[in-house]
Regions:
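Short hydrophobic alpha-helix segments
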Residues: 90-92, 378, 461-462, 498
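Short active-site loop at a secondary-structure junction
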Residues: 70-77, 99-157, 202-213, 291, ...
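Short, surface-exposed loop or secondary-structure junction motifs
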Residues: 92-96, 150-358, 364
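Acidic, glycine-anchored loop motifs typical of Ca2+
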Residues: 131, 271, 429
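Catalytic loop of the DD-peptidase/beta-lactamase superfamily, centered on the K-T-G motif
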Residues: 21-91, 223-226, 235-236, 278-423
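A short acidic/small-residue loop/turn micro-motif
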Residues: 94-99, 287, 382-383, 463-467, ...
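C-terminal outer-membrane/trafficking sorting elements
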Residues: 419-426, 430-504
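Bacterial Sec-dependent N-terminal signal peptides
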Residues: 1-27, 414, 428, 504
Length: 504
């Protein structure tokens, strides 16, 4: 068996500064990758089957098939909950390669990573609704002391990552070393809190820092108040009432006969991802170490139903949901706002609420209030988009589905079969100006717009198309460093959405 080394858990460590936080001594970023931060997508693509514009479901299927055809990722699953309550869902790829290759289906479970935090937060907030505790209670009211944990922290500060507590996973190398030596162990929350949390990064409520440790504490609060294990309480308060029959706190709960997709990770540094369960690497240690901060497994269909029920106002009291969505810390450079166990983004100008997460598997699940629509995408492969490895990952699939949904809604939108638009942006990252080259365009003129992470359009220009080719120079020299999205639109619809990073 290959010697495993586990490189990443929930939190994406971002060297580009996109997620930079104000405390320079704690350069650890919220995990969960942003659902709009890795966009480098040309849609639709010739590899896709023809699109029939007769239904939204066909439009989504075309977008999904178009983009996953370009990806080396082993498997994707996706779901969209429509305003009428119907769910579109699709899968592509393999669920395992060893001992034999099997196709991935929409019934396969995958780890949701830090989306688990939203389930835990909602459970605790329902207890607030029931009068069992207050958001402004100090955690020392319910919990025994732990090393490096200030009992003066409030429930509100815990759920919104304003405690400054050290992240036991991403900021303590001893945790990773202990995990590698105990891959088949079942970790307990008290063990993790007692032995693997280092000194705080900053005093209470003076800054913001994403820390998985906060949601170990949230799990223990649930246990102390309910008298049940945290996952029993989540099932009783959230999973069962919402009919989420494909979601489990693994390995504390097991999925029975429901299929669990294998995860793929490069464990020996040869640039080839391995089927971890297929080669015999235990997963119990990793998932139990994540515990109430990230151990749930699920399907995209359960994720979209959860997202719509919670953020659509059907689970929590109005005042509690308002606190969840308005009591947040915000990063103005990225558009991220983190509330009480929930993230808020503005994606292509549209507000959405939810969470994302990574535990080798990668997941996004967000609800769009103005559309009354939810989207979830999961992948069973650790590989992500980066400036040096521009692969199609779950973030890009997620954005492709948003674009397909919005385009379908536009009264003037029409779809063409066998459209082949290829786009190159160079240099990328750019220092101020970049060249945009698109071929395969069929109109005589196109509009190029550049949108920042907050959804604001910073450039909008018309360019001629000569011999089906656009060759344009775009100037962002007056803009701040960050992530931008380039859209190429003709008279009918958006033809290209691609990400460019500006690094001055």
């Amino acid at each position: 068996m290959k010697q495993p080394f586990l490189i990443s858990f929930f939190v994406l460590l971002c060297s580009t500064g996109i997620w930079a936080q104000s405390n320079p001594t704690t350069p650890f970023m919220p995990a969960p990758k942003a659902n709009f931060e890795k966009i480098g997508v040309n849609t639709p693509n010739q590899a896709a089957p023809p699109l029939f514009a007769g239904s939204l479901e066909e439009a989504l299927t075309h977008a999904f098939d178009s983009i996953v055809a370009l990806s080396p990722i082993k498997g994707f699953t996706a779901a969209v909950l429509m305003p009428d309550g119907n769910v579109w869902k699709k899968a592509s790829g393999v669920s395992q390669e060893l001992p034999s290759s099997l196709p991935l289906t929409t019934d396969h479970l995958m780890g949701m990573g830090s989306i688990s935090k939203s389930f835990v937060s909602v459970t605790l907030l329902k207890m607030v609704d029931a009068g069992l505790l207050s958001l402004d209670d100090k955690i020392s009211k319910y919990l025994d002391p732990y090393p490096n944990i200030n009992g003066e922290a409030t429930v509100r500060q815990v759920l919104s990552h304003r405690t400054g507590f050290n992240d036991y996973i991403n900021e303590n190398p001893a945790m990773n070393a202990a995990l590698v030596q105990n891959l088949d162990s079942i970790w307990e929350i008290d063990t993790l809190l007692s032995h693997y949390v280092l000194a705080p990064n900053f005093p209470l409520n003076t800054d913001w820092s994403y820390s998985n440790t906060n949601f170990l504490l949230a799990g223990r609060l649930i246990e102390k108040i309910s008298g049940k294990t945290w996952y029993e309480a989540v099932r009783e308060q959230v999973l069962t009432p919402l009919g989420l029959t494909h979601t489990f706190a693994y390995p504390f709960e097991t999925p029975g006969a429901q299929p669990f997709a294998h995860c793929f990770s490069d464990q020996d540094g040869d640039n080839v991802v391995d089927d971890l369960q297929g080669v015999g690497i235990p997963d119990e240690g990793l998932f139990s170490l994540a515990t109430s901060a990230g151990c749930f497994i699920t399907t995209p269909e359960d994720l979209v139903r959860f997202s719509e029920r919670v953020h659509g106002g059907h689970v929590l009291n109005a005042s509690t949901l308002a606190a969840m969505q308005t009591d947040f810390a915000q990063n103005p450079s990225t558009g991220l706002a983190y509330g009480l166990g929930a993230m808020q983004y503005t994606t292509l100008g549209i507000e959405n609420w939810g969470h994302n997460g990574s535990l080798i598997y990668n997941s996004n699940a967000f609800y769009f209030p103005t559309e009354n629509m939810a989207i979830a995408v999961q992948q069973n492969d650790e590989r992500l988009w980066s400036p040096t490895a521009q692969i199609v990952d779950g973030d890009i699939v997620f954005l492709s589905l948003i674009v397909a949904y919005l385009d379908y809604k536009q009264a003037t939108a029409t779809y063409e079969n066998n459209l082949d638009v290829q786009t190159i942006i160079s240099p990328n990252p750019a220092q101020g100006q970049f060249n945009l080259l698109s071929s395969g365009l069929e109109q005589d003129e196109v509009e190029v717009s550049v949108v920042n992470a907050l959804g604001a359009t910073v450039v909008r220009q018309q360019f001629p198309v000569v011999n089906q080719q656009l060759n344009a120079q775009i100037d962002l020299s007056t803009q701040a460093s960050g992530v931008y999205y380039v859209q190429v639109r003709d008279a009918q619809k958006v033809r290209v959405v691609q990400k460019v990073m500006l690094c001055k």
